[in-house]
């Protein structure tokens, strides 16, 4: 019995010893395997880093097997030594800026969101912006045009947004080729403002789209004459910094620094036109696109001063009329108002300014071009003098785009037009026309334009020499003089000097201000669009893409005029429901 017990003890001891030995062996094996894997990764990263630093940075490098997912994770980084395991990695040096994006396999598009190009000083939000150093995106997949965490404070309800909003989004087609040659570099379009939707029609045509946020409203366009306050047109300065960022980094993402276009719609289009008029002489931009911008090319594009409205807003929000500690001092002015408003919540400030119905636009500066004088609103175009041409940049093509009913939505939304008597409508029209043409032209224009008799409810309106007019016709009258006529006049002046200015007016049913941009940004499978609207959207995308790539929106042909006058050179889309046609008029002769 003792012998058996000894044998059992020995067996158990041996088994325990072997178990411990096997456990230790497995532990050391796992440890060695881990160390080996770590050194292998370090070696691989070092080799990749050496390759990246000794050669041109790769635009897109795809690692691993392909997948069928519609979206893949992408890293947009400035540091090639960051070890991140992802399907698609982009190594680019962009002032040490890091951001996350998505890969859209449907159109083979890479989207990069939330790239910081400057910082707003939160202590002094009306002041100069600050440079970006070692910035990393903290918002993940963030669309700067729609996410209130990164977009600029809105001037419309619900007044959301943040002060530190100087970001940009970049969209491009993915490629993995040798981009060392100029032939492969892609043209760039810098689109100003917070646009909702996708610009895949431009990206699919080989254009790199960069959407830029900049300060607008009161934070972007404080106009004053107080020498103590060094704030002036910060919104324009933000745009300048964004352009500088793009030109400095364009080659890193295969962008062509010789083909950079600045574009905008509506109020953003006004900023584009302002930049063209005041700063085109020193910017590396080779084209401009202005969509649906009212009063283009005129002095009305700028405001002289909004100091009084700032002081009023500051007092409403609690600023004392005189300094608390110095009652002998005079009343506070714009300097004190701006200092006080710097510490007011943006939403509260925007609400007060909205109630005061104040619109902030770029402030006038030193005129570098006499284009606004040559064709300014209120002056009849009599031809361009040779001395005026030397101030007009004839080397930079400009594309202007309008719809035939830009003003229609404003008329429809204003109840005063719906219930006004004839004399009220006539006064409104005369007020609009008198700002632009000599009085004797008012009656003449009404006789030519208003030809559609109609009734609004039970009322008949006769604002122009006994002719009746409906709301739609009134919208077209105001559109011609708020949007189309000023643009036509600046085109006439520029083309008279040999410039390449293009103007297109779209006429499609029930369209008004903003519908051209809405169609351009519509999705390919959007169900609420008709077949013709899809054709129209594709046509707009094709023209803009061709203009960005080549400098002209359509193929040039004989007797094709590159501009328009009040009644000539109009491109009409919707001449027939299912066909897109181009109608041009040169010296009174219509060609189809």
UniProtKB/Swiss-Prot annotation:
Active-site feature positions: 513 (charge relay system)
A Pfam family reported for this protein in Swiss-Prot or TrEMBL: COesterase
Enzyme class, spelled out: hydrolase
GO cellular component entries: membrane
Gene3D superfamilies named in the record: alpha/beta hydrolase
Keywords from the UniProt entry: Glycoprotein, Hydrolase, Membrane, Transmembrane, Transmembrane helix
E.C. number(s) listed in UniProt: 3.1.1.1
Entry membrane topology: Single-pass membrane protein
Principal cellular location given in the protein's record: membrane
Record: glycosylation sites: 68, 83, 95, 447, 510, 528
Keyword ATP-binding among UniProt keywords: no
Catalytic activity: a carboxylic ester + H2O = an alcohol + a carboxylate + H(+)
Localization in the cell: Membrane
Entry superkingdom: Viruses
UniProt-listed InterPro entries: AB_hydrolase_fold, CarbesteraseB, Type-B_Carboxylest/Lipase
GO MF assignments: carboxylesterase activity
Segments passing through the bilayer: 12-32
Similarity field: Belongs to the type-B carboxylesterase/lipase family.
Protein name from the UniProt record: Putative esterase
């Amino acid at each position: 019995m003792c012998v058996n017990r000894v044998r059992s003890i020995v067996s158990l001891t041996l088994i325990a010893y072997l178990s411990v030995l096997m456990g230790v062996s497995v532990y050391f094996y796992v440890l060695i395997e881990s160390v080996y894997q770590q050194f292998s990764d370090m070696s691989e990263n070092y080799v990749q880093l050496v390759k990246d630093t000794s050669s041109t940075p790769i635009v897109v490098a795809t690692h691993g097997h392909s997948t069928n997912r519609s979206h893949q994770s992408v890293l947009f980084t400035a540091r090639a030594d960051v070890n991140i395991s992802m399907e698609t990695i982009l190594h680019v040096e962009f002032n040490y800026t890091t951001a996350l994006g998505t890969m859209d396999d449907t159109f083979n598009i890479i989207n990069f969101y939330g790239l910081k190009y400057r910082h707003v000083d939160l202590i002094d939000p009306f002041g100069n912006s600050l440079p970006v150093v070692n910035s990393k995106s903290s918002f993940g997949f963030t669309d700067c045009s729609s996410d209130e965490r990164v977009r600029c404070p809105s001037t419309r309800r619900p007044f959301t947004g943040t002060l530190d909003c100087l970001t940009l989004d970049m969209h491009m087609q993915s490629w993995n080729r040798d981009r060392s040659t100029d032939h492969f570099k892609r043209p760039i379009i810098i689109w100003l403002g917070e646009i909702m939707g996708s610009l895949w029609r431009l990206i699919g045509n080989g254009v790199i789209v960069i959407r830029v946020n900049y300060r607008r409203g009161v934070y972007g366009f404080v106009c004053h004459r107080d020498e103590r306050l060094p704030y002036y047109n910060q919104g324009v300065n933000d745009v300048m910094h964004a352009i500088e960022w793009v030109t400095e980094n364009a080659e890193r993402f295969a962008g062509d620094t010789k083909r950079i276009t600045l574009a905008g719609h509506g109020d953003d289009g006004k900023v584009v036109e302002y930049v063209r008029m005041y700063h085109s002489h020193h910017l590396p931009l080779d084209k401009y696109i202005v969509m649906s911008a009212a009063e283009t090319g005129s002095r009305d594009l700028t405001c002289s001063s909004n100091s009084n409205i700032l002081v009023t807003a500051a007092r409403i929000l609690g600023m004392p009329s005189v300094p608390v500690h110095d009652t002998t001092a005079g009343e506070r002015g714009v300097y004190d108002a701006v200092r006080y408003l710097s510490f007011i919540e943006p939403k509260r400030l925007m609400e007060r300014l909205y109630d005061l119905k104040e619109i902030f636009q770029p402030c006038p500066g030193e005129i570098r071009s006499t284009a606004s004088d040559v064709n300014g609103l209120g002056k009849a175009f009599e031809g361009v003098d040779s001395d005026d041409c030397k101030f007009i940049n004839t080397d930079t093509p400009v594309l202007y785009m309008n719809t035939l009913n830009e003003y229609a939505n404003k008329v429809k939304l204003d109840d005063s037009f719906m219930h006004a008597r004839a004399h009220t409508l006539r006064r409104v029209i005369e007020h609009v026309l008198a700002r632009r043409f000599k009085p004797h032209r008012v009656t003449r224009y009404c006789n030519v334009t208003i030809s559609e008799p109609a009734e609004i409810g039970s009322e008949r309106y006769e604002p122009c020499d006994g002719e009746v007019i409906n709301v739609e016709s009134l919208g077209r009258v105001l559109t011609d003089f708020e949007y189309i006529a000023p643009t036509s006049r600046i085109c006439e002046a520029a083309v008279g000097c040999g410039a390449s200015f293009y103007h297109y007016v779209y006429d499609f049913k029930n369209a008004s201000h903003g519908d051209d941009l809405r169609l351009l940004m519509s999705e390919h499978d959007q169900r609420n669009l008709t077949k013709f609207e899809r054709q129209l959207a594709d046509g707009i995308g094709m023209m803009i893409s061709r203009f960005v790539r080549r400098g002209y929106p359509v193929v040039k042909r004989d007797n094709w005029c590159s501009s328009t006058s009040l009644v000539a050179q109009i491109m009409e889309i919707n001449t027939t429901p299912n066909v897109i046609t181009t109608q041009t008029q040169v010296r009174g002769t219509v060609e189809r």
